[in-house]
């Protein structure tokens, strides 16, 4: 392991020198003692030609030379536009996670070890030449004995030691950055590397990816918008995933889409609808929707349907995050910057002590220029990015789910405008958001929320009883006293009145519902009424 670490260090140093990344480092506002280090680096004593490549290109090429783990880290960084200069973020978007396949016999041996069976006993056909190969896994086509066409995804062998060593160096660099630079501390580099560590190890667990795929497939069962391939759970293991093979056109295959006369406007709009459906209906979204993971069905090109693969990275939002996000978007497009600032504070995304007026002014300064463009040219992803950048200046905590959301939105938006340049994202999204907001306060939703709260009443009653017993239990050193003081009387009567009113309202709501619902849920209302009456009339 130590030999691997030393070899890796020399490799990193060689790449740093080759692409002159030290120039990028020393251009930052560093302490004097850190700047003095440049005079003791031997390679800086020699004459150096000025590089013709931009800093973004040099950074991207360096990550490519350092291998797949650094490539994937660069891809993660490309989604953090709130942390990086735009020129570097744009270059990192070009990173391609493509590496040569590993030996096919090694792949077969690994699959057989995971399945506990020979390839010929599980598959009637297995293509030894892989369909695709990436840094974490490669994919082979096959056919099950039962006749289904499938793909078999297998994790590369020996990845964990390499990942562990590369992550160790990334953590060292991140901690150094936090120690020497106040600006770097604001960007939380150690937290960024920790997020990447979780992401990369999650991708090594193909059972997690299988579960994500099954969830997404269930969410869109019977949908005209999106199809997710079936997972064959009998043959899934931590390092092997077997799922239905799909046939479709790559979403970036413009010539193929044109040949089959695909309705490009509908295709672009359906992509936006899929995004908002995942966010606001399901609160579960595919967070790696780059063009390599998206296909278009060749069936019914006049009503095109997407096909999504590779659900290794997913995100989810809490109901509170959903609500604040929707309200933020509405407030932003109404140019109600005070409301946007207040929502950020109310949600806990920025500290409660943030000065509202200053935060509002900062948001206005950044966002007003955006509205000089026609509405159809305004980028949702850029809106979120600008809001996050501004909020970071006010110590906004990193919200991993919002980072994934921004990344997904940028992918969907960029893809939609590539398919149909006239796509008006706000006009497409606004009806969906308005419908979602209405449904949030509909009687059906409110009744459902009430039912879920009613189900908690037995637990609440038990907790209340335990609390009252603890309150009434005297300490050993205290003289015996009644379970409540006379000064508690008004509070207890107020609690009783609240229980009485709550029970009456709940009983009325239940009486408006179906009869079978009434019989199941009437007793909690009765308990509330009895407890309320007792607290009011008792002496």
Swiss-Prot record:
UniProt pathway annotation: Cofactor biosynthesis; ubiquinone biosynthesis [regulation]
Residue intervals passing through the bilayer: 23-43, 494-514, 517-537
PANTHER family: CHAPERONE-ACTIVITY OF BC1 COMPLEX CABC1 -RELATED, PROTEIN ACTIVITY OF BC1 COMPLEX KINASE 7, CHLOROPLASTIC
Originating species: Pseudomonas syringae pv. tomato (strain ATCC BAA-871 / DC3000)
Source domain of life: Bacteria
Function: Is probably a protein kinase regulator of UbiI activity which is involved in aerobic coenzyme Q (ubiquinone) biosynthesis.
Topology with respect to the bilayer: Multi-pass membrane protein
Protein name, entry field: Probable protein kinase UbiB
Protein kinase domain: residues covered: 125-492
InterPro entries, per the entry: ABC1_dom, Kinase-like_dom_sf, UbiB, UbiB_bact, UbiB_kinase
Location of the protein in the cell: Cell inner membrane
Pfam families: ABC1
Similarity-based family: Belongs to the ABC1 family. UbiB subfamily.
Entry binding sites for ATP: 131-139, 153
């Amino acid at each position: 392991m130590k030999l691997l670490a030393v070899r890796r260090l020399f490799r990193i140093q060689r790449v740093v020198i080759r692409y002159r990344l030290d120039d990028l480092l020393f251009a930052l506002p560093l302490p004097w003692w850190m700047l003095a280090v440049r005079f003791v680096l031997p390679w800086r004593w020699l004459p150096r030609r000025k590089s013709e490549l931009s800093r973004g290109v040099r950074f991207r090429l360096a990550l490519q030379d350092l291998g797949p783990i650094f490539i994937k880290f660069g891809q993660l960084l490309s989604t953090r536009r709130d942390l990086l200069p735009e020129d570097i973020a744009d270059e990192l978007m070009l990173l391609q996670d493509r590496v040569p396949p590993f030996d096919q016999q090694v792949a077969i041996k690994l699959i057989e070890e995971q399945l506990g069976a020979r390839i010929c006993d599980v598959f009637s056909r297995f293509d030894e030449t892989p369909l695709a190969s990436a840094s974490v896994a490669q994919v082979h086509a096959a056919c099950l004995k039962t006749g289904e066409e499938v793909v078999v995804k297998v994790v590369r062998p020996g990845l964990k030691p390499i990942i562990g060593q590369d992550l160790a160096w990334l953590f060292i660099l991140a901690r150094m950055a936090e120690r020497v630079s106040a600006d770097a501390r604001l960007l939380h580099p150690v937290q960024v590397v920790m997020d990447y560590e979780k992401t990369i190890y999650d991708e090594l667990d193909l059972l997690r990816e299988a579960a994500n795929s099954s969830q997404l497939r269930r969410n869109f069962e019977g949908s005209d918008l999106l199809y997710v391939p079936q997972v064959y759970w009998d043959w899934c293991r931590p390092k092997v995933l077997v799922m239905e093979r799909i046939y479709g056109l790559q979403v970036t295959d413009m010539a193929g889409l044109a040949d089959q006369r695909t309705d490009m406007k509908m295709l672009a709009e359906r992509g936006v609808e899929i995004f908002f459906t995942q966010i606001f209906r399901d609160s579960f979204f595919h967070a790696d929707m780059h063009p390599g993971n998206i296909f278009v069905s060749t069936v019914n090109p006049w009503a095109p349907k997407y096909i999504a693969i590779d659900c290794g990275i997913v995100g989810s939002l809490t109901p509170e995050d959903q609500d604040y996000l929707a309200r933020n978007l509405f407030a932003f497009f109404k140019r109600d910057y005070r409301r946007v600032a207040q929502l950020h504070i109310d949600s806990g995304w920025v500290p409660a002590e943030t000065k509202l007026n200053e935060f509002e002014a900062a948001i206005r300064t950044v966002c007003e220029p955006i509205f000089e463009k026609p509405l159809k040219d305004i980028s949702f992803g850029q809106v979120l990015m600008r809001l996050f950048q501004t909020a970071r200046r006010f110590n906004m905590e990193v919200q991993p789910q919002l980072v994934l959301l921004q990344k997904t939105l940028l992918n969907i938006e960029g893809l939609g405008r590539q398919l149909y340049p006239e796509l008006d994202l706000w006009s497409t999204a606004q009806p969906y958001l308005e419908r979602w907001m209405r449904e949030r306060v509909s009687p059906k939703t409110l009744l459902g929320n009430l039912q879920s709260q009613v189900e908690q009443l037995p637990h609440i009653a038990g907790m209340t009883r335990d609390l009252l017993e603890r309150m009434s239990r005297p300490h050993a050193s205290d003289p015996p006293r009644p379970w409540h003081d006379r000064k508690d009387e008004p509070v207890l009567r107020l609690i009783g009145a609240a229980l009485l009113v709550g029970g009456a309202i709940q009983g009325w709501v239940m009486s408006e519902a179906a009869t079978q619902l009434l019989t199941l849920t009437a007793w909690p209302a009765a308990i509330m009424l009895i407890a309320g009456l007792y607290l009011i009339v008792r002496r």
